[in-house]
Structures are given as C-alpha cells and as structure tokens.
C-alpha cells in the first residue's frame, strides 16, 4: 500500500514538472516569434535595392527592379509589356 501511494505521488510530481516546463516554453514562444519576424523584416529592407511593383518612382531613372519600368503616366513601377 505504501509503495503504490509513493508511486502515485511520484507520478503527480512528475506530471507537475512536465506541465510547468511546457508552460514556460509557451510563454517564451511569442517573444521568439516576434524577434524572428522583426529580424526577417530588417533583412528584407537591406536586401532590396530596387522598387517593387506599384511603388512610386521617377520616370527616366532606373529605380525599378528587372522586368519592370517606371510609368510616365502614373509614376509607378509596373511590369514591362
């Protein structure tokens, strides 16, 4: 009887420890996710040196990415046709 009570108590303690560890990992997950998102956004800003589609541009300058041209009418970067 004492052995079964000891095993039941040890099982409850083990369950508590596992649940506590899982909960602490869940609390840190949003922070890690946000830091990863902001790190990727910073990297994207440094990587791109040309204007994407529908971005404001100046006609005559070569600001748009390849396969795109600055429209003189709308002053937006658009696909070359």
Curated annotation (Swiss-Prot):
<dbReference type="GO" id="GO:0008200">
    <property type="term" value="F:ion channel inhibitor activity"/>
</dbReference>
<keyword id="KW-0528">Neurotoxin</keyword>
<comment type="function">
    <text>Binds to the nicotinic acetylcholine receptor. Blocks neuromuscular transmission.</text>
</comment>
<keyword id="KW-0960">Knottin</keyword>
<feature type="disulfide bond">
    <location>
        <begin position="57"/>
        <end position="70"/>
    </location>
</feature>
<protein>
    <recommendedName>
        <fullName>U6-theraphotoxin-Hs1a</fullName>
    </recommendedName>
</protein>
<dbReference type="GO" id="GO:0035792">
    <property type="term" value="C:host cell postsynaptic membrane"/>
</dbReference>
<keyword id="KW-0800">Toxin</keyword>
<keyword id="KW-0964">Secreted</keyword>
<feature type="disulfide bond">
    <location>
        <begin position="50"/>
        <end position="65"/>
    </location>
</feature>
<keyword id="KW-0732">Signal</keyword>
<dbReference type="Pfam" id="PF07740">
    <property type="entry name" value="Toxin_12"/>
</dbReference>
<keyword id="KW-0629">Postsynaptic neurotoxin</keyword>
<keyword id="KW-1015">Disulfide bond</keyword>
<dbReference type="GO" id="GO:0090729">
    <property type="term" value="F:toxin activity"/>
</dbReference>
<feature type="propeptide">
    <location>
        <begin position="22"/>
        <end position="48"/>
    </location>
</feature>
<feature type="signal peptide">
    <location>
        <begin position="1"/>
        <end position="21"/>
    </location>
</feature>
<comment type="similarity">
    <text>Belongs to the neurotoxin 10 (Hwtx-1) family. 51 (Hntx-8) subfamily.</text>
</comment>
<dbReference type="GO" id="GO:0005576">
    <property type="term" value="C:extracellular region"/>
</dbReference>
<dbReference type="InterPro" id="IPR011696">
    <property type="entry name" value="Huwentoxin-1"/>
</dbReference>
């Amino acid at each position: 009887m004492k052995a079964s009570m000891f095993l039941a108590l040890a099982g409850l303690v083990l369950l508590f420890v596992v649940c506590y560890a899982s909960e602490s990992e869940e609390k840190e997950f949003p922070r890690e996710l946000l830091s990863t998102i902001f790190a990727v956004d910073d990297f994207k800003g440094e990587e791109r040196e040309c204007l994407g589609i529908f971005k404001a541009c100046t006609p005559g300058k070569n600001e748009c990415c390849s396969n795109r041209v600055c429209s003189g009418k709308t002053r937006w970067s658009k696909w070359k046709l």
